[in-house]
């Protein structure tokens, strides 16, 4: 009889779902090189490219969003749900799945339902402080529930507890966390050389993700003169938003302060502007303070790296991003400011003062590190593999 393990992982749509999934998949492969690992996703999410690039097989189904109001989509939901669940059953059968691992999102829900109907053990990971509908469904049947937060609002079945394991980190961030723990100064110097910044001076990194954060961009750029009195700046604006930021910086501090990133730009001005940085781990390696949104992935990565941050939650939905940042703020690992309050006056009144107090920044960083978790991918992978050998319940 073959001892090959058969694992199916589910999730996708956004990088927030795909990256943790791939982090766990990579560790499973390291622990079980001969394992058959497949991923269920959609043909339209980021997983379409990222999963095959990572060397894993992608099986696609259609998104089946849960209906939230009585409309045409709600009427069509039962038939679509039945069809996609049947597709998933076929996928699980073909791959001889011994365990299913879901990371939330529309893709996960029919996978949970199909696995439950087939008696296949289920593990789930919830990255947000407030769980989504798919994982709330899966939690009813799961044998193992890992989460980035202690109380994400899941109701497990009897005998199962929600375990705060942290967020499985992208390989680049996991490597950086290890390097910082080993030698923070050397890691900072090496990264600074690649970016063209001075490793011996404070650095603020502003990022709103790949799409940017317009209000954050404007408030910070309009305060450039005040920030540059205390630190260098790397401002990652988001696609198509760098021209406006450069204009605002020029008004605040003059064109001469503007610069670009890279080893050939060492003599540039101290306010470096770019739409995006592929190797954001390099910026994190040099940073003394981050100004950012508070998506679950961002918060988990920054705390894993021990980086103090000013979190400006995206003002949408039910305030999910605020819930993500709150535990870190409670642990004194950073500050949180409402988007509407994050104005140029707020920046000028608070950020220079913080930059002028390295002891406070250091305390924030130490508290962030203490709150952060760096081994989530390993813990999840081992717990998933253990479910295969566990007697059926």
From Swiss-Prot:
State the organism of origin.
Answer: Bifidobacterium adolescentis (strain ATCC 15703 / DSM 20083 / NCTC 11814 / E194a)
The catalytic activity, as recorded, is:
di-trans,octa-cis-undecaprenyl diphospho-N-acetyl-alpha-D-muramoyl-L-alanyl-D-glutamyl-meso-2,6-diaminopimeloyl-D-alanyl-D-alanine + UDP-N-acetyl-alpha-D-glucosamine = di-trans,octa-cis-undecaprenyl diphospho-[N-acetyl-alpha-D-glucosaminyl-(1->4)]-N-acetyl-alpha-D-muramoyl-L-alanyl-D-glutamyl-meso-2,6-diaminopimeloyl-D-alanyl-D-alanine + UDP + H(+)
GO BP annotations, alphabetical order: carbohydrate metabolic process; cell division; cell wall organization; lipid glycosylation; peptidoglycan biosynthetic process; regulation of cell shape
* UniProt protein name: UDP-N-acetylglucosamine--N-acetylmuramyl-(pentapeptide) pyrophosphoryl-undecaprenol N-acetylglucosamine transferase
* Alphabetized UniProt keyword annotations: Cell cycle, Cell division, Cell membrane, Cell shape, Cell wall biogenesis/degradation, Glycosyltransferase, Membrane, Peptidoglycan synthesis, Transferase
Q: Which domain of life is it from?
A: Bacteria
Entry's EC annotation: 2.4.1.227
Looking up Gene3D superfamilies in the UniProt record yields: Glycogen Phosphorylase B
Query: Where do the TM regions start and end?
Result: none
Question: Highest lineage ranks of the organism?
Answer: Bacteria, Bacillati, Actinomycetota, Actinomycetes, Bifidobacteriales
Query: Topology in the membrane?
Result: Peripheral membrane protein
Q: Which GO terms describe its molecular function?
A: UDP-N-acetyl-D-glucosamine:N-acetylmuramoyl-L-alanyl-D-glutamyl-meso-2,6-diaminopimelyl-D-alanyl-D-alanine-diphosphoundecaprenol 4-beta-N-acetylglucosaminlytransferase activity; undecaprenyldiphospho-muramoylpentapeptide beta-N-acetylglucosaminyltransferase activity
**Keyword Cell wall biogenesis/degradation recorded:** yes
